[in-house]
Amino acid sequence: PLYDKVKRKHISQMTYFDYKNEVIITPKEWLEKAREKKLFYFWFAWQGMINFDFLKKIKLKFIDGIFAEDCHFGVLLFALSKNIYIFPKQICIYRLRELSSMNFTNKKWIIHPNSHLKKIDVFENSNTTRLYYESASWMQIALDFIKFIDSNHYLSEDIKTHFLPVVCNKALTLKKLDKDPLCLKKCTKNLKIYIQNQPLGAVDRVKEYLSYKLAKELSRKKGILRLTLPFSVIRVSLQHQKDTIEYKKSIKRNVLNKRLPLEFYRDYQQALSLKNQKLIQSLHGIGLKIMSLKG
């Protein structure tokens, strides 16, 4: 992608899939590669060509008005294909605009007066509105994946066990929100079955965050021991920075060393609750500043 007023290092999907030569693969091979590389999100829209006669035949369309519609479209397109031709050379540029709703790097999020998103603009906080929009989008993707799974396609079970759990976990965030303008919260009860076999691990991952470590250190220092807090913060921050550097080196050695996303785990929602505790949130910014100073 070409980032318009957005600073972001980008690693393409092709890098993770590690296709270096032209090759024709089957949908089963594509899915096995995604599983091997631990890729739980797959998207496809601008980065390839499609036989439109085939597209009309399978009656696949983008879901209107959602976030990450290319994830839904890409997974089902590749699953329903007969063959997939891989051309590993990058020959087109995707421009990512600063205020686009599809700008996944975007910190600033504005709903324009004529936007289709005005119907969900019922929250008092733009960040909450954005969270609802994304969660509701993942819900619609999850429901369409489930419809595909119920069609008894030969890849149904693979989609169910590999791509669906992370989507369901993202959609279940709807339960935390007090308003539901699209009336999708009622569907959350149907999703839990698809994450029940996932391992635990998200809460433990959050406990590795610098903000959590600082919060824990702060809670341990009582009375006169508070005087030693600055030294403890520096010690914890330096050790965290060292661990982070080692982790980044391990990824460079082998991309498979990259940690699984939090939403892969069954306890994702509990991890979000821990992550969003006020003390941990307030220390997150402090932790980032410390890391930038030490870096």
Predicted regions and their residues:
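Flexible linker/loop signature enriched in Pro/Ser/Thr and Pro/Gly
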Residues: 228-244
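Donor-binding/catalytic cores of nucleotide-activated saccharide
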Residues: 1-88, 92-131
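Intrinsically disordered, low-complexity N-terminal regions enriched in serine/proline/glycine
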Residues: 15-18, 93, 211, 239, ...
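C-terminal subregions of glycosyltransferases and related glycan-biosynthesis enzymes
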Residues: 95-225, 230-233, 251, 256-295
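Membrane-proximal transmembrane or re-entrant/amphipathic helices at the cytosolic face
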Residues: 245-246, 251
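A general marker of short, structured functional hotspots
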Residues: 12, 58, 90, 190, ...
